[in-house]
């Protein structure tokens, strides 16, 4: 049995941190699909390509070489792991990620990666689209306020100046866009295990997932 693990959920739910730790526990490759959409957003903004300029966006993606290296995302030889987390990228990523052609191209790349290795993959549409046949699917959620608090702490720890209210408003806005877009909206897979981590620490969520999987394999 392929040990592919899909972890979905809204912005700031802790998907990346938890997925990374789960991957380490089972010695699997970790693929952060959200980082890939953020990278496209970053590169598009650098070149002043708008989200509605589909042809230029597609050409841009074709020119990008993306791979993960020790939890870092390398794009055309550049480590963009820190820059893609900046507020400017966060505020625009939903607009670019909602473009059909962008999602088609990145989903193709993500499926290709998962076809080569057993993976832990996190995002918005992993359990429903990218790894819809994954044997293990989880949907992480938490209140918008708790998610904003976590993101604020994460960015502040990296000495990035941010405002809690701005983060909260951005999370609420992204929740709406991600859940209502026409292409692969954020939805919980029917066979996914839902985990509300509002009152759970990271270790508790990781332990729950690891124990759940360990009992099945």
From Swiss-Prot:
SUPFAM superfamilies registered for this protein in UniProt: P-loop containing nucleoside triphosphate hydrolases (SSF52540)
Subcellular location: Cytoplasm
Entry coiled-coil feature ranges: none
Keyword set, alphabetical order: ATP-binding, Cytoplasm, Kinase, Nucleotide-binding, Transferase
GO cellular component term of the entry, any: cytosol
Catalytic activity: CMP + ATP = CDP + ADP; dCMP + ATP = dCDP + ADP
Protein origin, superkingdom: Bacteria
GO biological process: nucleobase-containing small molecule interconversion; pyrimidine nucleotide metabolic process
Record-linked CDD domains: CMPK (cd02020)
Protein name: Cytidylate kinase
Naturally occurring in which organism (per UniProt): Clostridium acetobutylicum (strain ATCC 824 / DSM 792 / JCM 1419 / IAM 19013 / LMG 5710 / NBRC 13948 / NRRL B-527 / VKM B-1787 / 2291 / W)
């Amino acid at each position: 049995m392929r040990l592919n693990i899909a972890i979905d959920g809204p912005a700031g739910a802790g998907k990346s941190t938890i997925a990374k730790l789960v991957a380490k526990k089972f010695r699997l490759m970790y693929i952060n699909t959200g980082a890939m959409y953020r990278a496209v957003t970053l590169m598009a903004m650098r070149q002043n390509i708008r989200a509605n300029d589909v042809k230029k966006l597609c050409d841009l993606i074709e020119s990008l070489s993306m791979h993960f290296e020790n939890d870092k995302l390398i794009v055309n030889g550049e480590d963009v792991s820190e820059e893609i987390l900046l507020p400017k990228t966060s505020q625009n990523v939903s607009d670019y990620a909602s473009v059909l052609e962008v999602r088609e191209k990145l989903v193709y790349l993500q499926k290709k990666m998962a076809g080569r290795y057993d993976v832990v993959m996190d995002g918005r549409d992993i359990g429903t689209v990218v790894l819809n046949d994954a044997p293990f699917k989880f949907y992480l959620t938490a209140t918008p306020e708790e998610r904003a608090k976590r993101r604020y702490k994460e960015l502040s720890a990296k000495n990035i100046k941010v405002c809690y209210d701005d983060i909260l408003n951005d999370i609420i806005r992204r929740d709406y866009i991600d859940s209502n877009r026409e292409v692969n909206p954020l939805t919980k897979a029917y066979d996914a295990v839902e985990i509300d981590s509002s009152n759970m620490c990271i270790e508790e969520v990781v332990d729950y997932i690891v124990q759940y999987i360990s009992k099945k394999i």
